[in-house]
Curated annotation (Swiss-Prot):
Transmembrane spans: none
GO molecular function: ATP binding; ATP hydrolysis activity
Sections of the chain in a coiled coil: none
Record-given protein name: Uncharacterized protein MJ0079
SMART domains: AAA
Amino acid sequence: MSEIMHKLEKIREELNSYFLERREEIDIALTSILANEHTVFLGNPGVAKSQLIRAIASHINANYFEKLITRFTTEDELFGPLSIKELKDNDRFVRKTSGYLPTAEIAFLDEVFKANSSILNALLSIINERIYHNGDKIEKVPLISLFGASNELPEENELLAFYDRFLFRKVVRGIRSCENLVKLIKLDEEYKPKTTISIKELRKMQEKANEVDIENIIGYLVDIKKKLSQNHIYISDRRFKKSVKAIKCFAYLNGRREAEIEDLEILRHIFWDDIDDILIVSKVIFDITNKYAEQVLDKAEIIKNLKNELKYIDIKKIGECKKDYNKLIEILCKMAYIRLELKKIRNEAIINKRKTDFIDEVIKETDEFNNYIEGILNEL
């Protein structure tokens, strides 16, 4: 293992030891940086989206810019104040961009979809073309990756083009494991990176990642796009083309010079637009990369349906309604059976040396739902 590859692995380890149940988010962010692409993390407040992004940025000796976006955020706050001297001496509107987004190499915009129309066009030019129109001059922007965080997906049409420029999307959920919740309490408040890399080292990593051979997986990639199309999920040519680089970078992150079928799993975080499409996209991809995870998706769909059934039960009056009580017992029994099936699938995956990250995630979701139902019954 080369020195820079060793550094990358150390960064990955440090992040995973502090940010519990965030392995996928960390891999997505690092892949995004290697690919010179952008990532948006979605999720409820308090799931450490912002803290994780800051921590990842702290491992890179780069110009960093961060801003919380509101409906009232001005161009001055993002792109720099107007130069009074230029205005007085030359009658030109020029911004002093040093220390602001146009000079950043790594950037983070919190509540990113609250950006107003007055700054959207400039943001699009920066993240897509890496240029900023400063008065009558065009400035090159050294941006490597822009990270966004939001509690929700954008709904306004004018934001959709902006959302599309984030190649990677990930819904971040709260910690589910009781064991990890105990660990969380004991963690230091402040994350302190031990391993850092320079921009020069990062560029070297990017060069090496670009050399990864993808010949063996091209056919599978085309097949995934075709199957998603059959499921009415549209992948633009631009997004499809960019996904190739993402696969290369993900393979490199995993220490490979040739992309393997499992590297296609990074596409789970690229090929969806609506949250409702995540399961379909994952199912199509896992059907090719990991049959065990694909089996788990069927169980995840059943769990989703059982959760929906729970919505029609009046929890407050459960002790007074025998029908609702019996329904709750039925759901609990089904969940117990699903958990046994999931454990069986997980054991088979381990025997066959396949990844179990996604399986573990669904098992945790099952346990969480089971505990919720048992809590209701225990209160009766």
